[in-house]
Amino acid sequence: AIVSYGERLSSNIVAVLIDGAKWFDSRTFIKTEIKSGRQLLASDLTHELVKQAFVDLPKVSLVPGFISTDADSGEVTNLGRGGSDYTASIIAAALDASFLEIWTDVDGFMTADPKVISTAYTINELSYVEAMELCNFGAKVVYPPTIYPVCVKNIPILIKNTFNPSGKGTVIKSDIAEDQKPIKGISSINGTTLITVSGLSMVGVIGVNRRIFSALANNGISVFLVSQASSENSTS
């Protein structure tokens, strides 16, 4: 509950400063439930509650992002890193919005990290899959779960820079123009560990990978890339 005070206080202040704005308590309609030992979005319940909360839309709606409540206990929970973008996406999907705008501190997705590649430039359009891949592999423009709710409803996402509002930004949508360039962008993840389990005794043995991934999952380790030799004598 303590970590949610920043969003709750700041959104209330902004609501007071904007004429015609109404503050909504996201704890009343963003609900989570425990799945695999983690608090994850209770999608169906949340979508129904969002529709009920926004039956009458005011001129401006202010909603604190990131925070939620457990569907069963009512205890305050949160949506994790990037939860504010995720909150906006959840609401946009539930209300069948025409598009979702996310204002951040960059001009959009870049072809590469400008701190590493000085000639990197903003990508005008990306598909949902392309954006998800770049996010999963290090591009910290959008929190990956943000993409899924609007992707299902085919709602475009527009990424804009708060400090450069005139910038074109990046549009994420399903139908993008054909691009002659085979590579849209390059992203990377630092601090990655590669583990290889190998041995001739693995060949033809059923359930080896299940045991490997179960051991990692039981220790809270997420695997994002897998490679297995065709001879089945190693998994990385």
Segments (PLM) and residue ranges:
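Generic beta-strand/beta-sheet core signal
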Residues: 24, 63-65, 103, 144, ...
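Short, glycine-/Ser/Thr-/acidic-enriched flexible segments
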Residues: 67-68, 84, 96, 107-108, ...
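Surface-exposed amphipathic alpha-helical tracts and adjacent flexible/coil segments at the periphery
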Residues: 142-144, 153, 163-170
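A conserved regulatory-domain signal marking ACT and ACT-like small-molecule sensing domains
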Residues: 168-236
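Nucleotide/pyrophosphate-binding catalytic subdomain
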Residues: 1-143, 147
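Internal nucleotide-binding/catalytic subdomain
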Residues: 99-101, 156-159, 164-165
